[in-house]
Structures are given as structure tokens and as C-alpha cells.
Amino acid sequence: MPSTSMIEDRSEIERRRFEYLDHPADIQLHSWGSTMEEAFEACLVSMFGYMTDLAKVDEMYEFYWKASGDSLDGLLFQFLDEALNSFHAEPCFVAKRVEILRFDKKKFEIEFRGWGESFDTSKHETEADIKSPTYSNMQINEKPERCDIYVIVDI
């Protein structure tokens, strides 16, 4: 399983905008960006990156999703869960890159797309299986200069 300790170059962590934090039973994703949109994007990429090595994922096609929630936390949960469902069901899609197309913070709606390919066991190794995002200790910390997101995922 990937871990922060495996990556010695802190500049690489800053470039990709996410890291994995140890948790007693699961794993905590920590992502950030200069905007909430960037932090959401990085969080989703980190989720896929925890499941497989994204360096081996090619941007073969695009996948589109929509999600909605009843709060920002609910929206983040649905955002991650919607994409995770595409991994667990056909076409077993893995996103290497994500872009938010529409982000409505008042209606808690989001439209986004990812570039990647279908998971192929002959090409991709399974690092870990994420079953679901959780609300446990979920945090969205938005400041004028940066947004940080913390999400514990069930593995």
C-alpha cells in the first residue's frame, strides 16, 4: 500500500497535491489546492492512486460523472463514491487526471470528468481496495489562499 513514508521527496507530494496519512483501521486521504475545486480534484486522484499505481495508467478515454449532496461534506462523499462505483463496476475505470466542470456550492452539485482507462490486471497492480469513503472525521478547511480536505476511506 502506498504511504507517505515511501516518498522521500516532499516536493513530489506538493506537486501532486495529496498524501496518505496513517489511520488505525483505514487510510486518510489528505488533499489540497489553491481552491476547493483543486482540492476536490486532488482528493479523487489520490483515491485512485491509493488503489493502483497511476504512473501505469494511460489517458485512453474520458469518463463523466455528476453528484449531489445535502451539504459540502455530503457532496464530497457522493463525488468520491460516484467515481469509486465506476471502478467497482464495468468499465472498472481508473482516473489519472480529474477536472471539475461545474461546482455549485449553494446547491451542492458537481459535474466532473476524468481521464484514464479501464483497470486491467495484466497491466495494473492492485495496491489496496477502497470500499467506500466515510464521513468519519471528514474535513473541508477552506481559507482564502488554500483549501485542505481530509477523508478517511474504508479499505
UniProtKB/Swiss-Prot annotation:
Ca(2+) binds at residues 26, 154-155. Coiled coil: none annotated. SUPFAM superfamilies: MTH1598-like. Disulfide bonds: none annotated. GO terms for cellular component: tRNA-splicing ligase complex. The keyword Transferase does not apply. GO terms for biological process: tRNA splicing, via endonucleolytic cleavage and ligation. The keyword NAD does not apply. InterPro entries: Archease (IPR002804), Archease_dom (IPR023572), Archease_dom_sf (IPR036820). GO terms for molecular function: metal ion binding. Pfam families: Archease. Keywords: Calcium, Metal-binding, tRNA processing. Component of the tRNA-splicing ligase complex required to facilitate the enzymatic turnover of catalytic subunit RtcB (F16A11.2). Belongs to the archease family. This is Protein archease-like. It comes from Caenorhabditis elegans. The lineage of its organism: Eukaryota, Metazoa, Ecdysozoa, Nematoda, Chromadorea.
